[in-house]
């Protein structure tokens, strides 16, 4: 099992090109199920999760290839509208095939999902939405089984804001009969990116980027070309690493507008941040100031950046209060950061971080995707050697992280 071996060795300096967003690429790949025509997707990150999704699509009969970050999808010969447990158990986003399959083929069997163990993250909102659109759904033997002659447009109000739920219902609505209105829709840039691809494929969607999406169903969608939006969480992770190490880095290929909440907090921590149309520069001239925040849905502070800012706060001056409102069980990295010398206490959905001048290297274990990233940041600023075990979590969401960090001066090795 692979591990990271990190020697803390001072500031990160240089340039990093940001990859396409995993959380946009996965639903966009599923959108290929909505048409028999060819869909070409650029800027697809080379990750465990994207490879798993392509494998899942192939299992259903789709022709799916990826070369140099470009995925070519051809869904004319799909013969098995089923997502089996062996793949779904490793990746929650597999649920995203449910809406497209039932919309185009009238049937779908999808195993209940797996992925990072950071809370319940129920799929009931997906199911309620599809039922409102006329699907008959049963859950038995660990599978969600959905059937519909043709989905019917409906007004769907989700009980909570759900990113994958919005994406699933949006894809389903494109081929439904009549008008579908999705109220309380997620506004994340990744949802917007999916919607923009669907429009290129012939979908009729109004309200893109808002919490109310209005979809006029069409009889068929056609092929299209699209480029996946940049990964704002990868960008935020590298910015936190630079801030923690008192570095000076430039990120390329990232529009700063999708990272507003993170950049505000980095400036509050004392960083100098400059931006252009598709680049961000961060310089941290002195030890960071502790910053408190509360996670919430976009455009507020993202839950996927909580762990990385906790690592930054661990070596900041002062005390920060972090409140996690999106997922339960998302403080599993606290114990591991404390092994490195951090001073963090967590109770319920709140953590209090009192910054210390130095961390010290130790062996630690990754517990989920973003927790892994926080341990990497901590390892970069710790005295001595840090070894991070179970980095397969990290490989699910970061494209060659060790190579990108090495290029800006980090001493980080992948070892077996």
UniProtKB/Swiss-Prot annotation:
Its biological purpose: Cell wall formation. Adds enolpyruvyl to UDP-N-acetylglucosamine.
Catalytic function, reaction form: phosphoenolpyruvate + UDP-N-acetyl-alpha-D-glucosamine = UDP-N-acetyl-3-O-(1-carboxyvinyl)-alpha-D-glucosamine + phosphate
Subcellular compartments: Cytoplasm
Residues bearing PTM 2-(S-cysteinyl)pyruvic acid O-phosphothioketal: 116
GO biological process, one term: peptidoglycan biosynthetic process
Keyword Transferase carried by entry: yes
A GO term from the CC aspect: cytoplasm
Protein name: UDP-N-acetylglucosamine 1-carboxyvinyltransferase
Pfam family, one: EPSP_synthase
Example of a GO MF term: UDP-N-acetylglucosamine 1-carboxyvinyltransferase activity
Keywords carried by this UniProt record: Cell cycle, Cell division, Cell shape, Cell wall biogenesis/degradation, Cytoplasm, Peptidoglycan synthesis, Pyruvate, Transferase
Binding site for phosphoenolpyruvate: 22-23
Involved pathway(s): Cell wall biogenesis; peptidoglycan biosynthesis
NCBIfam families: murA, PRK09369.1
Residue positions of the active site: 116
InterPro entries: Enolpyruvate_Tfrase_dom, Enolpyruvate_Tfrase_sf, MurA_subfamily, RNA3'P_cycl/enolpyr_Trfase_a/b, UDP_GlcNAc_COvinyl_MurA
Keyword hit for Magnesium: no
Enzyme nomenclature, EC number: 2.5.1.7
């Amino acid at each position: 099992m692979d591990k990271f071996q990190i020697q803390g060795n001072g500031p990160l300096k240089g340039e990093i090109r940001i990859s396409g967003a995993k959380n946009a690429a996965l639903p966009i790949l599923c959108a290929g199920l909505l048409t028999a025509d060819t869909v070409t997707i650029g800027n697809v990150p080379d990750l465990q999760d994207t490879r798993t999704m392509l494998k899942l699509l192939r299992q259903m009969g789709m022709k799916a290839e990826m070369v140099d970050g470009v995925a070519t999808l051809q869904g004319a010969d799909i013969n098995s509208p089923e997502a089996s447990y062996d793949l779904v158990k490793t990746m929650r986003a597999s649920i995203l095939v449910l809406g497209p399959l039932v919309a185009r083929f009238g049937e779908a069997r999808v195993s209940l999902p797996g992925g990072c163990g950071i809370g319940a993250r129920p799929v009931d909102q997906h199911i309620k939405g599809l039922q409102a659109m006329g699907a008959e759904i049963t859950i038995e033997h660990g599978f969600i089984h959905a059937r519909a002659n043709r989905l019917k447009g409906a007004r769907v109000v989700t009980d909570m804001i759900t990113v994958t739920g919005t994406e699933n219902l949006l894809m389903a609505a494109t081929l439904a009969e009549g008008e579908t209105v999705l109220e309380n829709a997620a506004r994340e840039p990744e949802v917007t990116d999916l919607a923009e691809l669907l429009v290129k494929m012939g979908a009729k969607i109004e309200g893109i980027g808002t919490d109310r999406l209005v979809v006029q169903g069409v009889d068929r969608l056609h092929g299209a070309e699209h480029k996946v939006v940049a990964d704002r969480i990868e960008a935020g992770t590298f910015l936190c690493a630079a801030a923690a190490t008192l570095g000076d880095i430039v990120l390329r290929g990232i529009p700063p507008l999708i990272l507003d909440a993170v950049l505000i907090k980095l400036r509050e921590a004392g960083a100098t941040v400059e931006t252009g149309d598709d680049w961000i520069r961060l310089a941290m001239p002195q030890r960071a100031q502790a910053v408190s925040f509360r996670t919430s849905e976009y455009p507020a502070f993202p839950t996927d950046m909580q762990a990385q800012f906790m690592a930054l706060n661990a070596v900041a001056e002062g005390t920060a209060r972090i409140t996690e409102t999106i997922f339960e069980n998302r403080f599993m990295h606290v114990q591991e950061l404390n092994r490195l010398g951090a001073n963090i206490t967590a109770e319920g959905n709140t953590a209090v971080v009192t910054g210390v001048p130095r961390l010290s290297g130790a062996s630690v274990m990754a517990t989920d995707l973003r927790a892994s990233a926080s341990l990497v940041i901590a390892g970069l600023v710790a005295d001595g050697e840090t070894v991070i075990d179970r980095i397969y979590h990290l490989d699910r969401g970061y494209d060659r992280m060790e190579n990108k960090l090495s290029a800006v001066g980090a001493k980080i090795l992948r070892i077996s």
